[in-house]
Regions:
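Hydrophobic, small-residue-rich transmembrane alpha-helices and their short perimembrane loops
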Residues: 1-149
């Protein structure tokens, strides 16, 4: 039973950690949008895309959750190895939490610059993708772990 609890804790981390990061990152971008709308309301489409970008990290966590939860190992007879693997895969997503928050900050800076009249939407999108890579790596690592249990 303890092994099953460890495994389910890992599953919960796959949702909780990137979900928290995405919520914080999106709110950082959205807060910047509120201020930017006062200066340039015509750029709302750009603001909205940049604000929403941090939400993708939560999707990576959910995808990993779905992959692991579809495995048939979640029974009271789960092995310590499998339980620890699921927990470790969930813990990996602390990377996505941090990446989502930092991506939100990058997007907020881009939003502020667009509001100031600078044409930096494309460049901001490019720079904001860099933290995304680390969430993708976390997802890839979780996927590889899932293939070993």
């Amino acid at each position: 039973m303890t092994n099953l609890l460890i495994a389910y804790t890992g599953l919960a981390l796959m949702i909780i950690l990137p979900g928290i990061g995405s919520a914080i990152g999106v709110s950082i971008g959205s807060n910047a949008t509120i201020g930017a709308l006062k200066k340039r309301p015509d750029a709302f489409g750009n603001y909205m895309l940049l604000s929403a970008l941090s939400g993708t990290h939560g999707l990576f966590g959910f995808a990993a959750f779905f992959i692991f939860y579809s495995k048939t190992v979640f029974t009271p007879d789960i092995t310590p190895f499998a339980a620890t693997a699921v927990f470790g895969a969930g813990l990996i997503f602390v990377v996505a939490t941090y990446a989502a928050i930092r991506q939100g900050q990058i997007c907020a800076n881009g939003i502020a610059e667009i509001a100031s009249g600078n044409d930096v939407f494309g460049k901001t999108m490019i720079l904001a993708v860099f933290p995304e890579l680390y969430s993708i790596l976390a997802f890839a690592a979780a996927f590889l772990i899932s293939n070993k249990i």
